[in-house]
Amino acid sequence: MEDVFSYFEKPKDPIRFNAIKISIASPDKILSWSYGEVKKPETINYRTFKPERDGLFCAKIFGPVKDYECLCGRYKRMKHRGVVCEKCGVEVIKSKVRRERMGHITLATPVAHIWFLKSLPSRIGNVLDLTLKELERILYFESWIVLDPRNTPLRKKDLLSDEEYNDLREQYGPDGFQAGIGAEAVRKLLEEVDLEGLDVELRDELKTASSDTKRKKVIKRLKVIEALRKSGNRPEWMILTVLPVIPPDLRPLVPLDGGRFATSDLNDLYRRVINRNNRLKRLQELNAPEIIIRNEKRMLQEAVDVLFDNGRRGRAITGTNKRPLKSLSDMLKGKQGRFRQNLLGKRVDYSGRSVITVGPDLRLHQCGLPKKMALELFKPFVYNRLQEKGYVTTVKSAKKMVERETAEVWDALDEVVREYPVMLNRAPTLHRLGLQAFEPVLIEGKAIQLHPLVCTAFNADFDGDQMAVHVPLSIEAQTEARVLMMSTNNILSPANGKPIIIPSQDVVLGIYYLTRSKEDVLGHGMSFSNPEEVRSAFDAGAVELRARIKVRIDDELKETTVGRVILYEIIPEAISFDVINKVMNKKELANLIDYCYRLCGEKTTVILADRLKDMGFKYATHSGMSFAVRNLNIPKNKKDIVVRADRDVLEIQKQYMDGLITDGERYNKVIDLWAQATEKIASEMMGGIETEEQITTEGKKVVESFNPIYMMADSGARGSNAQIRQLAGMRGLMAKPSGEIIETPITANFREGLTVLQYFISTHGARKGLADTALKTANSGYLTRRLVDVAQDCIITQQDCGTVDGISVSALMEGGEIIETAGERVLGRVVLEDIMDPFTGEVLVGANQEIDESLSEKIDRAGIESVRIRSVLTCKAKYGVCARCYGRDLGHGHLVNIGEAVGIIAAQSIGEPGTQLTMRTFHIGGTAKFEEHSTLDSRHDGIVKYVDLNYVVSKIGETVVMSRHGEIHVLDEQLRSRGKYTVPYGAHLKVKDGQSVKRGDRMAEWDPFSIPILAEVDGTVKFGDIIEGKTMQEQVDEVTGLSRKVIVEFKGADLRPRVSLKDATGKTAKVPGTNAAARHLLSVGVNIVVSEGDQVKAGDIIAKIPRETTKTKDITGGLPRVAELFEARKPKDFAVISEIDGVVSYGKDAKGKRKVIVTPEIGDEKEYLIPKGKHVSVQEGDRVIAGEALMSGVNNPHDLLMIKGEKALARYLVDEVQEVYRLQGVKINDKHMEVIVRQMLRRVKVIDPGDTPFMADEQVEKFRFQEENEKAIARGEQPAIGEPVLLGITKASLSTQSFISAASFQETTRVLTEASLAGKVDYLRGLKENVIMGRLIPAGTGLVMYRKLGIKTVADEDAESVEIEGDENSNKKSLDMHAAN
């Protein structure tokens, strides 16, 4: 009996190996895999359906078709296991071997492997130093190659055409020299390659290489040779002599009805190879003419090419239905390939899906599961329970009973389901909260019920959405589902640490209604001694819900309303009444939940959320709120505003006709006008809706209105002011699909209705919106996929890496306003060094301490501007990152656990809001956007302080700013900066240094439509190289007939249009304080305002650079911008930036480009070429610092890395990405971006390899680089020199150490070719490669340190207690993991 199990093979355990290697298969290796040669192209006999002998499905080679049964039927069943039948030669064994046994085809002539030939760069070509064209001519029998020149003047590897070959043969005789053709010749050459010798030779050549191209070529060859040398692969293995045949069950042939067969394309491809191979063998035996044999060899080469990679060379071979056949490569590639279809995503059993509907009476940890569905999902458990209870004895009878659906079955199901977590998932699962665990509640009906508060996390609504249910089977899976995935354990969003379970829509409306107050209603002004009294009075109908009353709470008389006291009943005791004694809108409710979570913990918060939901629904129903047309009040003076705007537009038109303004300015002004009119009507309308007159005992009184539409928008339940504006105000300006704004606005609103033309104009935008949305989803999904791929191996691997490096974080400013204080930005991070109070000098936060909410407030109160914190960017951990550098796990609010997959969380957090970003590139036309940016108002009370501000007083007494980087700071009483405002060049200052300002005071203003060029000194205008008709044109406006002097593009001559100022002596004046001349070079498009010989004073405008008007420069925004940043692409018009500190001067123009020279105080000057027509943003004599832009344009991240280093670059990337998300109102914590940027900066480019094994220009991982250098230094040799490189996320994913991960991402063929050539080893460190290999992932509970936890049982007291003990411990095992830190 004990031997019976040895009959069954144990399933192979995927955990047993810890690395996997890929290399090129040698012919011997292929033969060792094979169980026999496939000689015939036949597959199966069409009459008997039995496989043909020696054919592609031969049972003798590949194993029996039926379990333990030979083909002729002589041996059947287990007792003959392992016998080989004498008659048909089939081994009696399980038929499963047909999935793993391989065969082979012995090729009549060698054939090149297309991957090594055509995958660029050609590997065979690299080894032999032949180009791909030359190789193809040899392999496809067009040219001969000289193998051994002997005594002839030919050189080895010379190519000869047929004619040349024949002539030379005649000349030198048959033994004069040796030449070959086809794959045999190439194989011969590859066999002769001496890798060691070639390696030495190439390294010497590299030292003497003169030109850059030569070096690059040698380096490329050296890489391939090195890879072959180190991996132990032989070059001739790239040419095949034996072809493996994959197991038949992996290329099945299935009979359809009607005698036809459905087959895998591979069978056709193999058939072609076998047919051609057999024909070639026959021709060779018959000694056929060389030309025929050669043609057959070429056809065999092509057949093998198509089998390996169809379409790689020439046209793809198509099958019967004009569809290209799927080759072996296609089986791996793309979304439908093996990697992504079957290994990374599999179908799941024990799952079901159905439509969802709302379950308002569920608790947060519950979901409603239809009985029918539950019965199907839990069937095996129900069978077991019925057997346990003794209703049935066998599974068969249990099955029958369940089919009858008797009462016992439902009882059993109830017991099985009780407290058994199931997982609900809604596609698309954009972040980890798209899959959560709930306890099922059995319900009638066929729809799954979902708790309303988790809808935000799932992004679900009930307009027909479907969700899937999955049952975790093992006890470990159940524990993980309960501990880690239960909806009650996922209150905070992992993206930003704010609660994601917050009331929305109806609930918000109900609670808003409950906490609003109303004048003069029943019970107004009553006083109560405690909340209970209020409740009884309300129940008795003695006081109305919104009445203002006084109540004694915590020995204090509070003014409040009845509704708020009722709300107070459900608030946890720890939270004071003042927190909710206000109108509770959505924001306040989110804050309440956040506050409750921090103060009272998870459990209390869950209870509070549920109570809020119940109360919200109840009072939303009570309020009887409705949406009616009468609620939309159109403002009385709308007509007047529109008429006035029309009049103003005509006025502007007239100015244009008179030539006072240009067409662009006219367009901008009109757009501005209408934007203002729309704004005005909207504010009038909102004013009308927000307030209403109420007749009270004190007479008429204006009070906040109870207009339902206003309440919906004000509470944050649904709708926004912008939408109400379109319903009752005026629709306003519309954009064309190109992004330009149409001058004529829609003056009607939806209540009045649109005319046909107005409707047509608005369809433009609407259609573009729909097209955008469709594109956006695909693009956003692809971005997420790239992010996940680059960050998937970023896991918390240790507690502390012990680094002494970190980054500085200061408050985030935008337009002078502090958007996020330093304290808020470092919340949940670990401090690098002690933070001192700048005034008292006491230590606020000790080094290596995590900053929690209270410390964050402390930092802000102390007015600390910048904090040094630890960051993943500077983490020293070799694999993954350490917990201290990462900081707080935002989803749970404590320091992150070891094993957390922070890379994937980062990728999800950035990718998930991707669909909310806009797709388009913004065109900031002349909309109200500009108008905001032409003035500067103080946002705080305080004292003005000029910083780096140079100014002059112009002749009309205006203070004009002359500096380019000037700032105005507003300081408070302690002289701490409250606001920093950058003042542009040419602005007019309205405040003096040291003056005190109030909030809202105007501090500066400037012309929004052009950038001025100002005179620095008094003097006379002199033009240089401004030649009419060549460099300058008087452009006459067609409409107005007025002229302007405009610099135009000019070809040829070395002309530099400029304006200089001459002093009294006629010399060029000097700029005060410097040695530079008062001279301005003008770029194309500048309008000159002065004429030659004019007298000007300092501060006067000489010329204007118009800001692009109708279509301003496209600001790449939204999703494309995020992708551009993460892909580290060079922007289209990137700015040239200075590499050094120094003084600017202009050099002689070269090749139509401006030459800007930066001269440092010590060292060599640097020259920069700037294309003409681009505006140079520095003047002669300006001081610049390293990293400062010399012209207008976007930064190029690669330059930033080179000049300012990794931290500055990381800061730039993080801030730029954040900017895009902030515009859409999405909050994502900086640390997620930092994780991605860390992955982009993982590699170093070797500049000088020193005595290390690296090659010049090779890119290597930072840690490998450091390791090799340490080794070299230890040996007393020269270490390598390298510089950091920035890789885009796609490049970074493909250059990861794991070839399995890279191959499953993109460019599968290329990755596998490279990996096999180099004999790469994948140590399975990331998540993806482990999923593909079918192992537990090395993160979370799959970490080795958690897997090794044992279970200790207490000494046997009695069997039962031991059982329980073991059970508890196995639960504990997973729980411990949660609290491991």
Swiss-Prot record:
SMART domains: RPOLA_N. One of its GO terms (biological process) is DNA-templated transcription. CDD domains: RNAP_beta'_C, RNAP_beta'_N. It comes from the Bacteria. It catalyses: RNA(n) + a ribonucleoside 5'-triphosphate = RNA(n+1) + diphosphate. Its cofactor is Mg(2+); Zn(2+). Pfam families: RNA_pol_Rpb1_1 (PF04997), RNA_pol_Rpb1_2 (PF00623), RNA_pol_Rpb1_3 (PF04983), RNA_pol_Rpb1_4 (PF05000), RNA_pol_Rpb1_5 (PF04998). Keywords: DNA-directed RNA polymerase, Magnesium, Metal-binding, Nucleotidyltransferase, Transcription, Transferase, Zinc. DNA-dependent RNA polymerase catalyzes the transcription of DNA into RNA using the four ribonucleoside triphosphates as substrates. Zn(2+) 1 binds at C70, C72, C85, C88. This is DNA-directed RNA polymerase subunit beta'. Belongs to the RNA polymerase beta' chain family. Binds 1 Mg(2+) ion per subunit. GO terms for cellular component: DNA-directed RNA polymerase complex. The RNAP catalytic core consists of 2 alpha, 1 beta, 1 beta' and 1 omega subunit. When a sigma factor is associated with the core the holoenzyme is formed, which can initiate transcription. Its EC number is 2.7.7.6. SUPFAM superfamilies: beta and beta-prime subunits of DNA dependent RNA-polymerase (SSF64484). Mg(2+) binds at D461, D463, D465. GO terms for molecular function: DNA binding; DNA-directed RNA polymerase activity; magnesium ion binding; zinc ion binding. Residues 1362-1381 are annotated as: Disordered. Residues 1369-1381 have a biased composition (Basic and acidic residues). Zn(2+) 2 binds at C801, C875, C882, C885.
